[in-house]
Protein backbone atom coordinates (compact mmCIF):
# COMPACT_ATOMS: atom_id res chain seq x y z
CA UNK A 1 0.00 0.00 0.00
CA UNK A 2 1.65 3.21 -1.21
CA UNK A 3 0.50 6.34 0.60
CA UNK A 4 0.25 9.87 -0.78
CA UNK A 5 -0.91 13.05 0.94
CA UNK A 6 -2.15 16.01 -1.09
CA UNK A 7 -2.99 19.14 0.87
CA UNK A 8 -5.60 20.37 -1.63
CA UNK A 9 -7.49 18.89 -4.59
CA UNK A 10 -5.51 21.24 -6.84
CA UNK A 11 -2.26 19.54 -5.73
CA UNK A 12 -3.29 16.10 -7.00
CA UNK A 13 -1.86 14.76 -10.27
CA UNK A 14 -4.19 15.47 -13.18
CA UNK A 15 -3.19 12.46 -15.31
CA UNK A 16 -3.88 9.61 -12.89
CA UNK A 17 -6.08 8.39 -10.05
CA UNK A 18 -5.38 6.14 -7.05
CA UNK A 19 -6.95 2.78 -6.28
CA UNK A 20 -8.53 4.47 -3.25
CA UNK A 21 -9.07 8.17 -2.62
CA UNK A 22 -9.64 9.36 0.94
CA UNK A 23 -11.23 12.80 0.96
CA UNK A 24 -10.78 14.88 4.12
CA UNK A 25 -12.54 18.08 5.18
CA UNK A 26 -12.47 17.91 8.96
CA UNK A 27 -13.94 21.42 9.40
CA UNK A 28 -16.56 20.39 8.56
CA UNK A 29 -17.90 18.55 5.49
CA UNK A 30 -16.51 15.05 6.06
CA UNK A 31 -17.34 15.25 9.77
CA UNK A 32 -20.91 16.18 8.79
CA UNK A 33 -21.08 13.34 6.23
CA UNK A 34 -19.93 10.78 8.81
CA UNK A 35 -22.34 12.13 11.42
CA UNK A 36 -25.32 12.15 9.05
CA UNK A 37 -24.76 8.57 7.87
CA UNK A 38 -24.15 7.36 11.42
CA UNK A 39 -27.46 9.00 12.40
CA UNK A 40 -29.31 7.01 9.74
CA UNK A 41 -29.34 9.25 6.67
CA UNK A 42 -30.11 7.22 3.55
CA UNK A 43 -27.24 8.88 1.67
CA UNK A 44 -25.32 12.12 1.31
CA UNK A 45 -25.25 13.50 -2.22
CA UNK A 46 -22.68 16.22 -2.81
CA UNK A 47 -22.75 19.16 -5.19
CA UNK A 48 -19.89 21.53 -5.94
CA UNK A 49 -22.35 24.09 -7.29
CA UNK A 50 -25.17 25.64 -5.26
CA UNK A 51 -27.50 26.19 -8.23
CA UNK A 52 -27.08 22.57 -9.26
CA UNK A 53 -28.14 21.43 -5.78
CA UNK A 54 -31.33 23.50 -5.87
CA UNK A 55 -32.22 22.39 -9.41
CA UNK A 56 -31.64 18.72 -8.61
CA UNK A 57 -33.59 18.83 -5.35
CA UNK A 58 -36.63 20.31 -7.11
CA UNK A 59 -37.00 17.17 -9.25
CA UNK A 60 -35.99 14.56 -6.64
CA UNK A 61 -38.88 12.26 -5.67
CA UNK A 62 -37.30 8.99 -4.54
CA UNK A 63 -36.79 9.64 -0.82
CA UNK A 64 -37.35 12.47 1.67
CA UNK A 65 -34.46 14.91 1.54
CA UNK A 66 -32.83 17.86 3.24
CA UNK A 67 -30.72 20.55 1.62
CA UNK A 68 -27.53 21.42 3.49
CA UNK A 69 -25.62 24.39 2.13
CA UNK A 70 -22.61 26.31 3.44
CA UNK A 71 -20.55 29.13 2.04
CA UNK A 72 -17.89 30.93 4.07
CA UNK A 73 -18.79 28.95 7.18
CA UNK A 74 -22.43 30.03 7.22
CA UNK A 75 -25.72 28.39 6.24
CA UNK A 76 -27.03 29.19 2.77
CA UNK A 77 -30.44 30.80 2.53
CA UNK A 78 -33.04 28.34 1.25
CA UNK A 79 -31.35 25.30 2.80
CA UNK A 80 -32.78 23.46 5.78
CA UNK A 81 -29.30 22.85 7.21
CA UNK A 82 -25.86 24.39 7.05
CA UNK A 83 -22.66 22.39 7.48
CA UNK A 84 -22.80 21.77 11.22
CA UNK A 85 -22.45 18.08 12.07
CA UNK A 86 -24.36 18.69 15.28
CA UNK A 87 -27.51 19.38 13.24
CA UNK A 88 -27.43 15.83 11.87
CA UNK A 89 -29.39 14.15 14.65
CA UNK A 90 -31.32 10.92 14.03
CA UNK A 91 -34.56 12.88 14.49
CA UNK A 92 -33.51 15.25 11.71
CA UNK A 93 -31.83 13.02 9.11
CA UNK A 94 -32.85 9.36 9.59
CA UNK A 95 -34.16 7.86 6.35
CA UNK A 96 -33.48 11.04 4.39
CA UNK A 97 -31.02 11.96 1.67
CA UNK A 98 -28.83 14.94 2.45
CA UNK A 99 -28.04 17.17 -0.53
CA UNK A 100 -24.80 18.87 0.52
CA UNK A 101 -22.72 21.68 -0.90
CA UNK A 102 -19.84 23.30 0.96
CA UNK A 103 -17.05 25.75 0.24
CA UNK A 104 -14.26 23.18 0.06
CA UNK A 105 -15.13 19.53 0.75
CA UNK A 106 -17.49 18.96 -2.14
CA UNK A 107 -14.88 20.30 -4.57
CA UNK A 108 -12.35 17.74 -3.33
CA UNK A 109 -14.86 14.92 -3.81
CA UNK A 110 -15.50 16.06 -7.36
CA UNK A 111 -11.78 15.89 -8.18
CA UNK A 112 -11.46 12.17 -7.33
CA UNK A 113 -14.99 10.89 -8.00
CA UNK A 114 -13.76 8.69 -10.88
CA UNK A 115 -11.35 6.71 -8.66
CA UNK A 116 -12.33 3.02 -8.22
CA UNK A 117 -12.91 3.55 -4.49
CA UNK A 118 -13.70 6.87 -2.81
CA UNK A 119 -14.22 7.19 0.94
CA UNK A 120 -14.36 10.16 3.30
CA UNK A 121 -12.45 10.59 6.53
CA UNK A 122 -12.55 12.83 9.57
CA UNK A 123 -11.19 12.53 13.09
CA UNK A 124 -14.56 11.24 14.31
CA UNK A 125 -14.43 8.15 12.05
CA UNK A 126 -10.65 7.75 11.78
CA UNK A 127 -10.54 4.18 13.08
CA UNK A 128 -13.22 3.01 10.64
CA UNK A 129 -11.09 4.36 7.78
CA UNK A 130 -7.97 2.64 9.12
CA UNK A 131 -9.78 -0.71 9.42
CA UNK A 132 -11.18 -0.44 5.89
CA UNK A 133 -7.78 0.30 4.36
CA UNK A 134 -6.05 -2.42 6.38
CA UNK A 135 -8.65 -4.92 5.18
CA UNK A 136 -8.89 -3.88 1.54
CA UNK A 137 -5.16 -3.17 1.04
CA UNK A 138 -5.44 -0.93 -2.05
CA UNK A 139 -2.15 -0.55 -3.93
CA UNK A 140 -2.26 3.26 -3.94
CA UNK A 141 -4.03 5.55 -1.48
CA UNK A 142 -4.40 9.30 -1.88
CA UNK A 143 -5.35 11.36 1.16
CA UNK A 144 -6.84 14.48 -0.38
CA UNK A 145 -7.27 17.44 1.93
CA UNK A 146 -9.92 19.96 1.01
CA UNK A 147 -7.96 22.96 2.26
CA UNK A 148 -9.59 26.38 2.14
CA UNK A 149 -10.19 27.83 -1.31
CA UNK A 150 -7.04 26.20 -2.64
CA UNK A 151 -4.84 26.80 0.41
CA UNK A 152 -3.29 24.36 2.90
CA UNK A 153 -5.20 23.48 6.07
CA UNK A 154 -3.76 22.14 9.31
CA UNK A 155 -6.84 20.14 10.29
CA UNK A 156 -7.03 18.11 7.07
CA UNK A 157 -3.30 17.40 7.13
CA UNK A 158 -3.29 16.23 10.75
CA UNK A 159 -6.22 13.89 10.03
CA UNK A 160 -4.35 12.40 7.07
CA UNK A 161 -1.39 11.91 9.40
CA UNK A 162 -3.57 10.28 12.05
CA UNK A 163 -4.68 7.66 9.53
CA UNK A 164 -1.35 7.23 7.75
CA UNK A 165 0.46 6.67 11.06
CA UNK A 166 -1.64 3.55 11.64
CA UNK A 167 -0.95 2.26 8.11
CA UNK A 168 2.75 2.99 7.69
CA UNK A 169 4.98 0.04 8.58
CA UNK A 170 8.18 2.10 8.63
CA UNK A 171 9.24 1.04 5.14
CA UNK A 172 10.25 3.96 2.91
CA UNK A 173 8.75 2.14 -0.10
CA UNK A 174 5.31 2.86 1.37
CA UNK A 175 5.85 6.61 1.21
CA UNK A 176 4.54 8.07 -2.02
CA UNK A 177 5.59 11.64 -1.21
CA UNK A 178 7.24 13.68 1.52
CA UNK A 179 3.89 15.08 2.61
CA UNK A 180 3.07 11.73 4.25
CA UNK A 181 5.92 12.14 6.76
CA UNK A 182 4.96 15.77 7.30
CA UNK A 183 1.37 14.79 8.07
CA UNK A 184 2.39 11.98 10.44
CA UNK A 185 4.81 14.30 12.24
CA UNK A 186 2.13 16.96 12.66
CA UNK A 187 -0.21 14.37 14.17
CA UNK A 188 2.48 13.05 16.52
CA UNK A 189 3.11 16.57 17.81
CA UNK A 190 -0.56 17.49 18.32
CA UNK A 191 -2.39 14.20 18.93
CA UNK A 192 -3.03 15.07 22.59
CA UNK A 193 -4.52 18.48 21.77
CA UNK A 194 -6.28 18.39 18.41
CA UNK A 195 -8.85 20.87 19.71
CA UNK A 196 -6.04 23.32 20.42
CA UNK A 197 -4.57 22.81 16.95
CA UNK A 198 -7.94 23.27 15.26
CA UNK A 199 -8.46 26.56 17.08
CA UNK A 200 -5.10 27.78 15.75
CA UNK A 201 -5.93 26.74 12.19
CA UNK A 202 -7.15 29.48 9.85
CA UNK A 203 -10.54 27.83 9.33
CA UNK A 204 -10.84 27.24 13.05
CA UNK A 205 -10.29 30.97 13.45
CA UNK A 206 -13.13 31.63 10.97
CA UNK A 207 -15.47 29.42 12.96
CA UNK A 208 -14.44 31.12 16.21
CA UNK A 209 -15.30 34.49 14.66
CA UNK A 210 -18.72 33.01 13.88
CA UNK A 211 -19.00 32.03 17.58
CA UNK A 212 -18.86 28.33 16.68
CA UNK A 213 -16.28 26.84 19.04
CA UNK A 214 -18.68 23.99 19.80
CA UNK A 215 -18.41 22.64 16.24
CA UNK A 216 -14.61 22.78 16.44
CA UNK A 217 -14.68 20.75 19.65
CA UNK A 218 -17.01 18.19 18.06
CA UNK A 219 -14.81 17.84 14.97
CA UNK A 220 -11.66 17.42 17.09
CA UNK A 221 -12.93 14.21 18.71
CA UNK A 222 -11.25 10.99 17.58
CA UNK A 223 -12.87 7.63 16.85
CA UNK A 224 -16.33 8.50 18.14
CA UNK A 225 -18.30 7.21 15.12
CA UNK A 226 -18.09 3.68 13.71
CA UNK A 227 -19.09 4.57 10.17
CA UNK A 228 -17.37 4.59 6.79
CA UNK A 229 -18.86 6.81 4.08
CA UNK A 230 -18.14 5.25 0.68
CA UNK A 231 -19.07 6.49 -2.78
CA UNK A 232 -21.65 4.26 -4.46
CA UNK A 233 -21.99 6.41 -7.58
CA UNK A 234 -20.32 9.73 -8.46
CA UNK A 235 -21.17 12.24 -5.75
CA UNK A 236 -23.28 9.83 -3.67
CA UNK A 237 -21.99 8.51 -0.35
CA UNK A 238 -23.57 5.80 1.75
CA UNK A 239 -22.55 3.97 4.91
CA UNK A 240 -20.30 1.04 4.02
CA UNK A 241 -21.78 -2.36 4.79
CA UNK A 242 -19.32 -5.18 5.28
Curated annotation (Swiss-Prot):
One of its GO terms (molecular function) is sulfopyruvate decarboxylase activity. It comes from the Bacteria. Its cofactor is Mg(2+). InterPro entries: ComB-like, ComB-like_sf. The keyword RNA-binding does not apply. It catalyses: (2R)-O-phospho-3-sulfolactate + H2O = (2R)-3-sulfolactate + phosphate. Belongs to the ComB family. This is Probable 2-phosphosulfolactate phosphatase.
Amino acid sequence: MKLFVYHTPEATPTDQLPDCAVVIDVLRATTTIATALHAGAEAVQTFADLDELFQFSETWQQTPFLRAGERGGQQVEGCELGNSPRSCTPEMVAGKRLFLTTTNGTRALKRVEQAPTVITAAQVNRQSVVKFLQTEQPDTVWFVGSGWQGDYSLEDTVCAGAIAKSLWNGDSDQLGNDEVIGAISLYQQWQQDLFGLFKLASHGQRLLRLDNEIDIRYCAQSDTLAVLPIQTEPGVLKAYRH
